[in-house]
A protein has these predicted regions:
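C-terminal alpha-helix plus adjacent terminal tail
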Residues: 1-11, 42, 161, 165-166, ...
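Conserved CoA-thioester-binding segment of acyl-CoA-metabolizing enzymes
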Residues: 1-54
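Hydrophobic/aromatic residues within transmembrane alpha-helices
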Residues: 16, 51, 63, 112-114, ...
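Hydrophobic alpha-helical membrane-association signature
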Residues: 31-35, 79-82, 227
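Glycine- (often His-adjacent) and acidic-residue-rich active-site loop
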Residues: 45, 53-89, 105, 252
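A general structural signal for well-ordered alpha-helical segments in protein cores
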Residues: 64, 83, 142, 151-154, ...
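Crotonase-fold acyl-CoA enzyme core
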Residues: 88-201
């Protein structure tokens, strides 16, 4: 692994940290390639990945200086291809991804939040899409918020270039929780530890179902049948479900049983 992405192994979960603090963790080509390598190394290794940034920024998007240099050199200033790879690497990864949004998240940073399965932000985090100021549509973060937010809230981010705080992002449903900065990593890693207690196959199949059902299925019966198929795949992959019912019948609690958020 290089120096632009830092990885900490924590047992059943890992913390992957964007590590360009001098650039507010803007993602140049080299950082995107290292990030893809880090994601690949976590396949079949950890059940959960916490994604965060070094110092006071989560990710300020693409490296605009590199993009501008490319334009002057005649290189097409379009980082789309490897951003698509990053998008697919997270969404198709078997692990559950948790964004720990520790500060500024602009453009590509907002994309990373949308891509992750769960997200916790500092109350003061700043999330925004500056692309309209460059006469551009946010081609990755825009679709993400349009899927996850109401149309007016998505339009606010896309059309005004104004940033919202982590607290507002929680109220809008863009993140699950907003917490004081000092508590962010403690909360994110505690959540990672709780999620990592569950069966790996069940986590992966549930992740896939959470994405597939809203996007592909609009009829209740088909949705229920899809859910039945998901559980069949989990059962066929091992005996985790049988073990769970056996624990319950013997008077033991399964992870998550009998507790609220």
């Amino acid at each position: 692994m290089g120096t632009l992405i830092a990885v900490e192994e924590k047992g059943d979960y890992a913390v992957i940290r964007l590590n360009r603090p001098e650039k507010k963790n803007a993602m140049n080509r080299a950082a995107r390639r290292e990030l893809l390598d880090a994601f690949g190394a976590q396949r079949d290794r950890n059940k959960v990945v916490v994604l965060t940034g070094t110092d006071d920024s989560f990710c300020s998007g693409v490296d605009l200086k590199e993009t501008g240099t490319d334009a002057k050199d005649g290189t097409p200033p379009d980082p789309s291809s490897d951003w698509i790879e990053v998008t697919l690497a997270i969404r198709e990864h078997p692990a559950i991804f948790i964004a720990a949004v520790n500060g500024i998240a602009l453009g590509g940073g907002a994309t990373l939040i949308s891509l992750c399965d769960l997200a916790i932000a500092t109350q003061e985090a700043e999330i925004g899409m500056p692309e309209i100021g460059f006469a551009a549509y946010p081609q990755f973060s825009g679709p993400g918020v349009q899927i996850q937010l109401t149309s007016k809230r998505a339009a606010w981010l896309v059309l005004t270039a104004e940033r919202i705080t982590g607290a507002t992002a929680e109220a809008w449903g863009l993140v699950n929780r907003a917490v004081p900065r000092a508590a962010l990593m403690m909360e994110a890693e505690a959540l990672a530890g709780r999620v990592a207690r569950f069966d790996a196959t069940a986590l992966t199949e549930c992740k896939r179902a959470l994405e597939a059902i809203p996007q592909r299925i609009s009829e209740w019966r088909a949705a229920f049948e899809y859910g039945i198929d998901v559980n069949a795949r989990i059962r066929n992959a091992g005996n985790a479900q049988q073990q769970g019912f056996a624990r319950f019948e013997s008077g033991l609690r399964n992870p998550g049983q009998g507790k609220s958020c």
